[in-house]
Amino acid sequence: MSDIAITISLLALVAVIGLWIGHWKIRGVGLGIGGVLFGGIIVAHFTNQYGLKLDAHTLHFVQEFGLILFVYTIGIQVGPGFFSSLRKSGLKLNAFAILIIVLGSIAVVLVHKIADVPLDIALGIYSGAVTNTPALGAGQQILAELGVPQTTVTMGVSYAMAYPFGICGILLAMWLIRLFFKVKVDDEAARFNAESSQDKESLHNISLKVTNQNLDGLTLIQIPGFSDEEVVCSRLKRDDMEIVPKASTEIRINDILQLVGDDNSLAKMRLIIGYEVDAPTVAYSGEIRSERVVVTNEKVLGKKIRALGIHQKYGVVISRLNRAGIELVPTGNTTLQFGDVLHMVGRSDVLNQAISVIGNAQQKLLQVQMLPVFIGIGLGVLVGSIPFYIPGFPVALKLGLAGGPLVVALILARIGTIGKLYWFMPPSANLALREIGIVLFLAVVGLKSGGSFFDTLVNGSGLEWMGYGIFITFIPLMITGILARLYGKLNYLTICGLLAGSMTDPPALAFANEIKEDNGAAALSYATVYPLVMFLRIMSPQLLAVLLWAA
């Protein structure tokens, strides 16, 4: 067999062993995808003993391509929610997540300066302690740019030393915070449910009876609120007749309007129109129905709802729009993206015609447009290679192969559609590419670092590196968790999700969810901080490398 064939065969063997190890669980907690790293270490230990030669160029390509695949698909996944997570509702949670990252970075500086740990090893320990593999890739990239030799081996070994407690440390922090504040989980869950029901900003339906004499004879568009497109009127009931109103529909006293909007907008409409009636409007004789329709027609991508003329042509109202899990009130100026879910209301005989304009081809949601994938990857590599200069920094910074594809993917996923190209990827396809990428990357890191792992652990500084990893993992989590409880007044379950999200650690999220099942507090806070944290975890090793290398 050629060296390339041997190398690829061993990579497959590493993946099999590593994924098998990752499925081992103790009390529901396992290494997960991190098991691939240890699979690589085990295989590398024996390949060194038997003198098997691996092709260095193949390993290098597989490592870099795996990293690119992983960070790009992460960006596509979190892109739609990345910018919305920075809004007011997530500011407090993201602020505490940033604090964890800052404290962890300070801990790295202390380990490097006071304990005199080499920079590459310190960054490897940092990546393992926060269980973030893209951070490892980003650190290796920037150190290679700075001319530090053998970064893959030393960083891989130190990463592996710190990784196991990186997972366990999060769980320990959750447990200690619970003991310290004598938390009663059932009370926390009840408090979260009560607060979330009050603060929920999703859209609602109400039915209002027109009693304001000033509105009699006005068209719908002339009524304040409708002209501002704050709410949508999906149905109008007059006596025994029910219609889907148009902007030009005249309103009469005692008409019943079914409105869709947020609580504040609906409260304003009560003051303008009249009082709320208990019985919602219903469709008579099956003439009016509603459907949830997915935007899949390439001809409407990037177009405004007004330009489609659906309301004018078919008398169909789009009452709600769900984009990446966020409910919006659609307006005439709303631009449609692939995968948007529209709630459409209209007469049965014409609703299907309107649906055909939007698409609603479910099979398209299972397909992947490969052209946008490679455009995104190509642009990401290009952006990652562009140097930019910051005053006071000794060298030009680059986003690199870890940061470039991530930033480009975030932007493209947020834009959603350019012409007939759409940066939507089915969750199953995204997960598959992401898992392939991270498995390839970790397999190579394990193979490169495995030869010296056991010697470092037994005869070298392995145990010392583990101690530094515990310091970097545990101290920032405990400090932030206590501050979030004392001063942030955060719910304990929310704090657990915050800690798991700040480490981008799915096993920790699974543990947090099991603390109180059927409660979404942990998952919600995890999802809120995850996009920003993933971005900062990739950028922080690069900034630390440049700052500490120059110091």
UniProtKB/Swiss-Prot annotation:
Residues 191-275, 277-360 form the RCK C-terminal domain. SUPFAM superfamilies: TrkA C-terminal domain-like. It comes from the Bacteria. GO terms for cellular component: plasma membrane. InterPro entries: AAE_transporter (IPR050144), RCK_C (IPR006037), RCK_C_sf (IPR036721), Transpt_YidE_put (IPR023018), YidE_YbjL (IPR006512). Pfam families: Asp-Al_Ex, TrkA_C. One of its GO terms (molecular function) is monoatomic cation transmembrane transporter activity. The keyword Cell membrane applies. Belongs to the AAE transporter (TC 2.A.81) family. YidE subfamily. NCBIfam families: PRK03818.1, YidE_YbjL_dupl. This is Putative transport protein NTHI0043.
